[in-house]
């Protein structure tokens, strides 16, 4: 995940193992059938922080590939026919002027005030963007102790929607919130575009090919010990476990 702490536990720990196993299985099949070709396994780091595959693609890593196949863990067996969101990842760094918060606050220019005002502006902006737009933020540096006017503050933003054009529009408006906050607080702001990607397009032919292949693969079976372990996990997490287990292959959606 390349996230601090636990992260968000969406199963990225399974990616490398399954991809390596799939590559070995495909190699064995190619050797058995006499098929020609080269298989490569890529590790794509920092997906959650900077959309690692986008950076790798921009640097030409995948230029000579005929096809690239990816997968993601899920809570059931399915083939995705979804359109995944276009996204901008940005860092906003506000620069102010440090001063003692009790002795001479009037001499300070709070970078943290600017960051907070930016976030207030973005939260008011939510009413005026399309319903599929998402704008998430976190503080990644808020400067000095409370008795010092902070001269630096940093926020990290993820801005998403299902269309690149909407993402770009929302992203520019978030930038304007940052610029306005800097103007109000007599600070400055640096805007860093960490990564940017367009929405994922659906290829119906490949989707159906995947689905047909998955119908030929036996679905997993679990031992009583494994089911008991799963129940313990859900209880520890405070989740509801009604004892049922999804099995089989989820039907393919007609439309993305």
Positions of PLM-derived features:
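Metal-dependent amide/peptide-bond hydrolase catalytic core
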Residues: 112, 116-256
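Cytochrome P450 catalytic-core helices
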Residues: 16-21, 25, 56, 210
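Flexible, small-residue-rich helix->loop connector segments that border functional cores
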Residues: 21-36
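Internal helix-loop-helix
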Residues: 7-8, 23
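Inter-helical turn/loop segments and adjacent helix faces that build the functional surface
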Residues: 29, 33, 101-105, 164-169, ...
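Residues that form or flank phosphate/diphosphate-binding pockets in enzymes
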Residues: 17, 51-52, 102, 165, ...
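Histidine/acidic-residue-rich, glycine-tolerant segments that coordinate divalent metal ions
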Residues: 3-7, 13-14, 32-150
């Amino acid at each position: 995940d390349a996230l601090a702490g636990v992260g968000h536990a969406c199963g990225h720990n399974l990616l490398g193992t399954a991809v390596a196993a799939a590559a070995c299985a495909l190699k064995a099949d190619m050797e058995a059938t006499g098929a020609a070709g080269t298989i490569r396994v890529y590790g794509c780091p920092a997906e959650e922080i900077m959309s690692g595959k986008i950076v790798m693609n921009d640097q030409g890593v995948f230029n000579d590939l005929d096809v690239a196949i990816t997968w993601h863990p899920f809570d059931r067996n399915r083939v995705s026919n979804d359109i995944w969101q276009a996204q901008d990842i940005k860092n906003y760094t506000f620069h102010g002027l440090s001063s003692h918060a009790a002795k001479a606050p009037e001499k300070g220019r709070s970078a943290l005030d600017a960051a907070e005002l930016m976030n207030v502006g973005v939260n008011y902006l939510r009413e005026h963007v399309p319903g599929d737009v998402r704008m998430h933020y976190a503080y990644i540096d808020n400067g000095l102790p409370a008795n010092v006017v902070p001269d630096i503050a940093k926020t990290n933003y993820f801005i998403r929607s299902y269309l690149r054009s909407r993402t770009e529009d929302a992203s520019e408006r978030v930038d304007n919130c940052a610029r306005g906050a800097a103007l109000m607080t007599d600070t400055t702001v640096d805007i860093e575009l960490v990564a940017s990607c367009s929405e994922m397009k659906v290829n119906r032919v490949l989707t159906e090919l995947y689905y047909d292949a998955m119908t030929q693969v036996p679905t997993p079976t679990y031992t009583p010990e494994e089911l008991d372990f799963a129940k313990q996990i859900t209880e520890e997490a405070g989740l509801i476990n009604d004892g049922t287990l999804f099995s089989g292959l989820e039907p393919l959606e007609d439309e993305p």
